[in-house]
Amino acid sequence: MATYTCITCRVAFRDAEMQRAHYKTDWHRYNLRRKVANMAPVTAEGFQERVRAQRAVAEEESKGTATYCTVCSKKFATFNAYENHLKSRRHVELEKKAVQAVSRQVEMMNEKNLEKGLGVDSVNKDAMNAAIQQAIKAQPSTSPKKAPFMPTDESRRVAGAVRRGTPERDPTEKPPRLQWFEQQAKKLAKQQWEESEEEGEEDDEDWEDIDSDDGLECENPGVEEEDAEDAEAEESPPLGAIPITDCLFCSHHSSSLVKNVAHMTKVHSFFIPDIEYLSDLKGLIKYLGEKVGVGKICLWCNEKGKSFYSTEAVQAHMNDKSHCKLFTDGDAALEFADFYDFRSSYPDYKEGQDPAEIEDLSSEKILECDDETMELILPSDLEYFD
């Protein structure tokens, strides 16, 4: 009959099932550690004696901590003496000082969190007090009988809330960056639809008479009021947008837009690319204020990198990473095309020329044909030879 053994514990089993069960016991794991340390294995009886001795020590330590004052670093023989000590004036004064010391540490943590963009207004006061009490109990002491502080799940959650300075965020909530990009996509689709509607109305003007126009105006008296309300809604800045007189990268406020741009250039090394062709400075800074304040988006990272959930956090990121600049490489420059006018860089541009005149050039001017030679003549008066 086959014999099943454990070389580490030096025991034998009558079947494989008992052997597999033995491999899962604490006794076998204990002997494995002793084997790694080049020590002889212990028997099952010896292991049980060690376990009982360890439990007795743990119980003794737990009794010691039950009558030990962590604030005053004193041990008491009985619970009555311990209870009387908790009511003494000296203990109350020391506990108050300990609370003040821990409170200062919490305030310092909150100041650091503010620098990182995490607020403290939403912290529950009860949660903060509970975390302070837990921190007082966890303070190190000189007593050899004091057992180490083991925080519970509740204390970890409370202390984490105090350190972060913000409540736990819903994991299903969309990041502000994604919400902002979706809003921009909707605005672009609406703008394209309105432009197509305007083009269709212009094409239909030749087929409509004055009477029909008057009839439409009478049938829809509230259209103009609705358009006015939509215009007012578009003019009002969205919630959280940074004003054009506030810095995009810190809390500095300027008295004018020009001074604000000068501050960002001097303090944060911010510069506007191709500024000689910039036609709408106010619109550009307003757009960037919405991008940073509403979308919580880094001007350099854009859709790449980590998501931010507060304006202070994305501002701290841009300052720390030197991202106080616009990303305009490749197709990314098209994002700011509405704020620029590059017509002055065209070789055939004439100062004061209406851009509509350039777009409305007739096809006869673009392509002409010589009646005698049947050659195409380009707008620059150059002949085309096949």
Swiss-Prot record:
Presence of keyword Nucleus: yes
Residues modified to N-acetylalanine: 2
UniProt subcellular location: Cytoplasm; Nucleus
Gene3D superfamilies: Classic Zinc Finger
GO MF term (any one): nucleic acid binding
PTM text: Phosphorylated by MELK. The phosphorylation may redirect the protein to the nucleus. Ubiquitinated by HECTD1, leading to its degradation.
Composition skew (Basic and acidic residues), residue ranges: 165-176
Zinc finger (U1-type): 4-28, 67-91
Swiss-Prot/TrEMBL GO biological process terms: intrinsic apoptotic signaling pathway in response to oxidative stress; positive regulation of apoptotic process; positive regulation of JNK cascade; positive regulation of MAPK cascade; ribosomal large subunit biogenesis
Keywords annotated in UniProt: Acetylation, Cytoplasm, Metal-binding, Nucleus, Phosphoprotein, Repeat, Ribosome biogenesis, Ubl conjugation, Zinc, Zinc-finger
InterPro entries named among the record's database cross-references: Matrin/U1-like-C_Znf_C2H2, ZN622/Rei1/Reh1_Znf-C2H2, Znf622/Rei1/Reh1, Znf_C2H2_jaz, Znf_C2H2_sf, Znf_C2H2_type
Pfam families (UniProt xref): zf-C2H2_2 (PF12756), zf-C2H2_jaz (PF12171)
A GO cellular component entry from the record: preribosome, large subunit precursor
Entry keyword annotation includes Nucleotidyltransferase: no
Region of interest (Disordered), residue spans: 135-237
Subunit structure, as described in the record: Homo- and heterodimer. Associates with pre-60S ribosomal particles. Interacts with MELK and MYBL2. Interacts with DNAJC21.
Function (record text): Pre-60S-associated cytoplasmic factor involved in the cytoplasmic maturation of the 60S subunit.
Homology family: Belongs to the REI1 family.
Protein name: Cytoplasmic 60S subunit biogenesis factor ZNF622
Lineage: Eukaryota, Metazoa, Chordata, Craniata, Vertebrata
